[in-house]
From Swiss-Prot:
GO molecular function, one term: ATP binding
Localization (cell): Cytoplasm
Family per similarity comment: Belongs to the class-II aminoacyl-tRNA synthetase family.
Identification of the protein by name: Glycine--tRNA ligase
Organism the protein comes from: Streptomyces avermitilis (strain ATCC 31267 / DSM 46492 / JCM 5070 / NBRC 14893 / NCIMB 12804 / NRRL 8165 / MA-4680)
Record key words, sorted: Aminoacyl-tRNA synthetase, ATP-binding, Cytoplasm, Ligase, Nucleotide-binding, Protein biosynthesis
Gene Ontology CC terms, in alphabetical order: cytoplasm
Residues that, per the record, bind substrate: 99, 162, 209-213, 321-325
Matches recorded under CDD domains: GlyRS-like_core (cd00774), GlyRS_anticodon (cd00858)
Primary role: Catalyzes the attachment of glycine to tRNA(Gly).
Length: 460
């Protein structure tokens, strides 16, 4: 993977309407992004596939949608108010601020060893001066706000840094109303917020982001088995949607870097190839033990244990948590799908072609309907076909420009099929279907086109 591929994806994303800089007419908001028409579709397709795989295709997982702003007591009990912080350091030469642990991790990735003298051995990524960092101080990752007409200590509230706590506080109600018993899971997708010191790398690290999380409640003693199970399931989900295994790996957090609630955390890392860092976290699968349920039970005075009727005993479930970010998944799928090859133009000359070889289930547009020209007979027929196909899939109608250029536009946004309505259509009532990756073309009767596409767009 080329080192400048991220820049290529950023350019493509803006040019084709996947992702735009936030508030760009005012100069932009740092590390904040808006998702355009194609980006919204890609995001929704990723979320839809996650929900199908993790929830609706299983009998042991149910869903929930909890509030973004929870009671302040939730974050006190969970340990976030006391411990959700990062080590902040500043370069005394250029006054750029960094997370100290990120500087050390980048050093380790480059030199295959830890800096012997800590920050004193590290050059500033901005100005290049060595060892000019201040002593790290803890910086809270919580974003706070005030509720109500007054702004005092009693009105402080927090925007959730994770969706998980809304699941834990609803555990007993969901378990009872859904009539589930461990092992079972509760899943949630939604926005979370973290006051990142050094956001960046496009949509990889932002202060506002969307999560896909599931908390799987199991009997203590069975947690390690279930963590291995969900690690394999999450790996399979990514590879099943097209990520290549050579661009993925597992990273087990060392004991000294585990979160305050974790017994073990393993990350799926992807070869993002950011400047200085080849690998980046794609998704984490954590064993949170009974930390959260026990903490909330103690703080609230409510019983969050489970009575096992078969065993005749009561216990507090352990929790296995696969937690993914929609933005990071989207970036990985875009990077993995991006290909440059060659294809003949109208004159038979080979030209460079850019293709997003996205799995059709993720492709923002499933089918493009293209009349050969803006002919008064062809256009109405093509528009009628597009209207009929929209009952099933997201369809794009395009009649502007040469047909070869329109094919290239669709290749670049990942559309798996182009359907061309030409002058022969008026006689034989058939259309030409072009497949994105192979560029092979096939003639299909109009009365069979829906079935033809449906057989190739299963799961879309």
């Amino acid at each position: 993977m080329a080192a400048d591929k991220i820049d290529t994806i950023v350019s493509l994303s803006k040019r084709r309407g996947f992702v735009f800089p936030c508030s760009e007419i005012y100069g932009g908001q740092k590390a904040a992004w808006d998702y355009g028409p194609l980006g919204v579709e890609l995001k929704e397709n990723i979320k839809r596939q996650w929900w199908r795989y993790m929830v609706t295709s299983r009998e042991d997982v149910v869903g929930i949608d909890s509030s973004v702003i929870l009671a302040t007591e939730v974050w006190v009990a969970s340990g976030h108010v006391a411990t959700f912080s990062d080590p902040l350091t500043e370069c005394t030469s250029c006054h750029k601020r960094y997370r100290a642990d990120h500087l050390e991790e980048a050093y380790e990735a480059k030199h295959n060893r830890s800096p012997e003298n800590g920050l004193a051995d590290i050059n500033c990524p901005n100005c290049g001066n060595k060892g000019q960092f201040t002593e790290p101080k803890q910086f809270s990752g919580l974003l706070s706000t005030h509720l109500g007409p007054t702004q005092d200590s009693g009105s402080v509230a927090y925007l959730r840094p994770e969706t998980a706590q809304g699941i834990f506080t609803n555990f007993a109600q969901v378990q009872q109303t859904s009539r589930r018993k461990p092992p079972f899971g509760i899943a949630q997708m939604g926005k979370s917020f973290r006051n990142e010191i050094t956001p960046g790398n496009f949509i990889f690290r932002t202060r506002e982001f969307e999560q896909m999380e599931m908390e799987f409640f199991v009997k203590p003693g069975e947690d390690e088995k279930w963590q291995e199970f969900w690690m394999q399931e999450r790996w399979n989900w990514y590879t099943g949607l097209g990520l290549r295994e050579e661009n993925m790996r597992w990273y087990d957090h060392p004991a000294e870097k585990l979160s305050h609630y974790s017994k073990r955390t393993a990350d799926i890392e992807y070869r993002f190839q950011f400047g200085g860092n080849e690998w980046g976290e794609l998704e984490g699968v954590a064993n949170r033990t009974d930390y959260d349920l026990s903490a909330h039970a103690k703080a609230s005075g409510q019983d969050l244990s489970y009575f096992d009727q078969e065993a005749g005993e009561r216990w507090t479930p352990y929790v296995i948590e696969p937690a993914a970010g929609v933005g990071r998944a989207m970036l990985a799928f875009l990077l993995d799908a991006y290909v440059e090859d060659e294809a003949p133009n109208a004159k038979g000359k080979m030209e460079k072609r850019t293709v997003l070889r996205l799995d059709p289930r993720l492709s923002p547009v499933k089918v493009a309907v293209l009349p050969l020209s803006r002919n008064p007979e062809l256009s109405p027929k093509a528009k009628g076909l597009a209207t009929a196909l929209r009952q099933h899939w997201n369809i794009e109608f395009d009649d502007a420009g040469a047909i070869g250029r329109r094919y290239r536009r669709q290749d670049e946004i990942g559309t798996p099929f182009c359907v061309t309505v030409d002058f022969d259509t008026l006689d034989d009532n058939a259309v030409t279907v072009r497949e994105r990756d192979s560029m092979k073309q096939e003639r299909v009767s109009l009365d069979q086109i829906e079935g033809y596409l449906a057989a190739r767009l299963i799961g879309c």
